[in-house]
């Protein structure tokens, strides 16, 4: 009888504990959304502890600028206009809770700030403020505890980066002082021949033009949304193909210094430079593709261009880059995930900015923005390494995820791949789709991904080489 009572008591106790645990596990959602589309809270949050990276201060936009609307392709002109040249913020921080002594105060044109030197370990207090008509409206005081630990990610300031930027050209896809060694070293690589074969095919291929854009269905469409969507798709067919062809010629020139590739690429770039002025060319991808070609031509062929050609390219870069920066400025940095930006357009503006820095005054601002917004927000918009935007589109981002930190690492000597996000992202990339497996299912079109594609494998191969991660290397070995 005692044994029965004891067993009954144990069962009741366990049941009670399970019920209590289940009650504790219930999370009630009270917000309208799981996350804010535009930043609604300062970062770091009050009482936060930061120990994995240098602190980046970030805060919400002014209420009159805090639009959640990211312009659709072809509808950029519909976005509410604010004179962003007059937008400024103040930030102050100190280890004094009253912000009376040892205060660092800065003014910034964007709602984020990366201190030039990492904050020393300890408790810090900070405030942001909106500046309007010379008056500052301060937010509440936030507290953040900074801890130190081995391997903490503390990239250099922009001042350090620019001090190491070469004055000559090329300096983006290849550094001029390394060019000859690069050519000689590339002769041992199989990939070199792939690029040259593609470029040789391009030399034999007549260019298409904007007149080849298929507009046959426009007459059957009912509204501006349908027309712009259709023209965006059809114009991309032409521009994507011609961008790929011309980029192949530029790469072949950098691999060989053979003038036949340079001359043909220069001719094609100047034909395409004004294509974005055509009424049938729509969308930010098309605009960024043309900016990429103009800036890569300027940097790669600098010593072959005459004065008027350089001037024309700088003017094109100024106009295209200016429009792109205007779209980013005081919007993108607070948007949770503007996919086109992460996939392509920020990378292109970054490379364009560094290609003309020192030659185009506007590039001073672009370089500042691109570099510091990368430190503040990138590479993954989170800390765990997962690509929460959706796995099917993950591989569209791989050029940005590799090329931008690689370029910064090359310039500075600091390893941008030491960002702890990359080690987490390697695990995500592997476990989201193991060798010879379908995607685990996250985001649109994941059901169409039947096995790891070449881009996913190539991305892990690049990270294995750049970080020494043996899991990534093993994944590549097993899937090839």
What are these regions (language model features)?
Residues 1-23:
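Bacterial Sec-dependent N-terminal signal peptides
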Residues 23-77, 145-147:
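Pro/Thr/Ser/Gly-rich low-complexity, intrinsically disordered linker/stalk tracts
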Residues 69-121:
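Recognizes extended acidic, P/S/T-rich segments that occur
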Residues 131-149:
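Extracellular fibronectin type III
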Residues 144-174:
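Low-complexity, Pro/Ser/Thr- and charge-rich linker/hinge segments at domain boundaries
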Residues 195, 227-438, 445-446:
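Aromatic-lined, polymer-binding surfaces characteristic
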Residues 442-480:
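N-terminal leader/propeptide and maturation segments of large enzyme subunits in energy/redox metabolism
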């Amino acid at each position: 009888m005692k044994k029965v009572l004891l067993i009954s008591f144990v069962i009741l106790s366990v049941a009670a504990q399970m019920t209590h645990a289940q009650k504790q596990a219930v999370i009630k959602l009270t917000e309208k959304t799981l996350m804010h589309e535009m930043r609604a809270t300062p970062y770091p949050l009050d009482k936060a502890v930061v120990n994995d990276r240098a602190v980046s201060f970030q805060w919400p936009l002014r209420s009159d600028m805090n639009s959640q609307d990211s312009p659709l392709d072809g509808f950029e002109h519909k976005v509410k206009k604010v004179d962003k040249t007059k937008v400024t913020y103040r930030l102050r921080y100190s280890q004094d809770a009253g912000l009376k002594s040892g205060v660092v105060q800065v003014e910034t044109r964007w709602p984020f700030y990366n201190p030039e030197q990492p904050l020393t370990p300890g408790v810090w207090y900070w405030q942001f403020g909106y500046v309007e008509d010379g008056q500052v409206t301060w937010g509440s005081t936030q507290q953040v505890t900074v801890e130190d630990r081995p391997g903490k990610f503390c990239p250099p300031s922009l001042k350090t980066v620019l001090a190491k930027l070469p004055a000559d050209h090329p300096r983006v896809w290849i550094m001029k002082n390394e060019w000859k060694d690069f050519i000689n070293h590339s002769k041992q690589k199989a990939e070199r021949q792939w690029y040259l074969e593609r470029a040789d095919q391009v030399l034999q291929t007549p260019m298409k033009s904007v007149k080849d854009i298929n507009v046959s269905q426009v007459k059957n469409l009912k509204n501006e949304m349908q027309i712009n969507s259709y023209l965006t798709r059809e114009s991309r067919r032409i521009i994507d193909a011609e961008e790929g062809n011309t980029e192949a010629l530029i790469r072949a020139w950098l691999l060989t210094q053979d003038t036949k590739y340079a001359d043909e690429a220069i001719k094609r770039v100047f034909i395409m430079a004004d294509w974005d002025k055509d009424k049938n060319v729509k969308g930010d991808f098309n605009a960024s593709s043309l900016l990429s070609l103009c800036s890569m031509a300027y940097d790669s062929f600098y010593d072959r261009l005459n004065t008027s050609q350089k001037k024309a390219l700088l003017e094109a870069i100024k106009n295209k880059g200016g429009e792109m920066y205007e779209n980013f400025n005081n919007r993108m940095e607070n948007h949770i995930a503007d996919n086109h930006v992460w996939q392509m357009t920020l990378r292109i503006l970054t490379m364009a900015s560094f290609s003309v820095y020192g030659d185009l005054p506007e590039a001073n601002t672009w370089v500042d923005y691109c570099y510091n917004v990368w430190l503040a927000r990138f590479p993954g918009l989170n800390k765990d390494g997962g690509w929460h935007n959706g796995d099917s589109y993950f591989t569209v981002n791989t050029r940005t995820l590799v090329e931008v930190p690689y370029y910064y690492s090359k310039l500075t000597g600091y390893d941008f791949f030491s960002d702890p996000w990359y080690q987490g992202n390697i695990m995500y990339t592997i476990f989201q789709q193991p060798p010879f497996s379908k995607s685990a299912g996250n985001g649109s079109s994941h059901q169409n991904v039947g096995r790891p594609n070449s881009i996913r494998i190539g991305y892990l191969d690049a990270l294995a080489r750049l970080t020494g991660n043996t899991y990534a290397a093993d994944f590549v070995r097993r899937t090839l």
